[in-house]
């Protein structure tokens, strides 16, 4: 959205009217349409409704537990330890995964993740989610500084 919006906004600033050509496999996509027409408010409204229906921020808190290691089986064993240490999911907290990250191997490290979402109506400031993932880390008895390494990302900017 940002690049299309920026290109469309810069086109035709001078005396000569500009034109932006967008090549896409999905030209009817609302994101492309709103960006090309410089409809920031409409795009914002669509995204906000979509995030609300999926329970993504700003309507929830998210934490990503990512394991990275050079040996695939160690990463898998560690993520299974974390998963098995979860006895019961608290009300309002949802678990996604475990699963391999979008890029399973990055810089000679295998990567797996578990994502937890906490609904703000049950957890207004995120403390329930924080206590929950801290207890998981303690109960799973994983050494967070060894191979594989555990990375905790609270409200990640990307889930890839």
Language-model features: locations:
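Accessory helical-bundle/CTD segments and flexible terminal tails appended to RecA-like ATPase motors
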Residues: 6-160
